[in-house]
UniProtKB/Swiss-Prot annotation:
Cross-referenced InterPro entries: Ubiquitin-like_dom, Ubiquitin-like_domsf, Ubiquitin_CS, Ubiquitin_dom, Ubl4_C_TUGS, UBL4A-like, Ubl_UBL4A-like
Task performed by this protein: As part of a cytosolic protein quality control complex, the BAG6/BAT3 complex, maintains misfolded and hydrophobic patches-containing proteins in a soluble state and participates in their proper delivery to the endoplasmic reticulum or alternatively can promote their sorting to the proteasome where they undergo degradation. The BAG6/BAT3 complex is involved in the post-translational delivery of tail-anchored/type II transmembrane proteins to the endoplasmic reticulum membrane.
SS bond partners: none
Keyword Nucleus on entry: yes
Glycyl lysine isopeptide (Lys-Gly) (interchain with G-Cter in ubiquitin) crosslink residues: 48
Entry's localization field: Cytoplasm, Cytosol; Nucleus
Domain of life: Eukaryota
Biological process annotations from GO: post-translational protein targeting to endoplasmic reticulum membrane; regulation of protein stability; tail-anchored membrane protein insertion into ER membrane; ubiquitin-dependent protein catabolic process
Domain Ubiquitin-like positions: 1-76
Region (Required and sufficient for interaction with BAG6): 96-138
Keyword set, alphabetical order: Cytoplasm, Isopeptide bond, Nucleus, Phosphoprotein, Transport, Ubl conjugation
Protein name stated in the entry: Ubiquitin-like protein 4A
Recorded name of the encoding gene: Ubl4a
Source organism of this protein record: Rattus norvegicus
Amino acid sequence: MQLTVKALQGRECSLQVAEDELVSTLKHLVSDKLNVPVRQQRLLFKGKALADEKRLSDYNIGPNSKLNLVVKPLEKVLLEEGSAHRLVDSSATPIWQLISKVLARHFSIGDASRVLEQLQRDYDRSLSRLTLDDIERLASRFLHPEVTEAMEKGFCK
């Protein structure tokens, strides 16, 4: 069936999908057509937000239907994802497990635990204080190291 997805900024695209297609799959198609990252998309049908795990047929979306696309600001997405990560026990992530093993080699169990907890708090605090400018600078350094190196050499002379 043919669907039209219209962003609030005025861009729109037509997509060919199956009636029982997952909303998450539709978001990937929209991402390809409109160049909007999936995690920044919120699709609406008749004013109702569509859940990723549901199918288009669950919302009675038929041929020639029109869906609205709301693009969430990246800052909001990052904040939401940060909150979700805090709900998960951060000590379960592989990097924290690895750090825990290293600390255990050099400290008693109690001291290693306290150092790990403080390190996690400091890490979370540092991440929460990053601005978009900070993130842009970091990304530029990773993506264009030759420019950063040239700038540093220029400033050192």
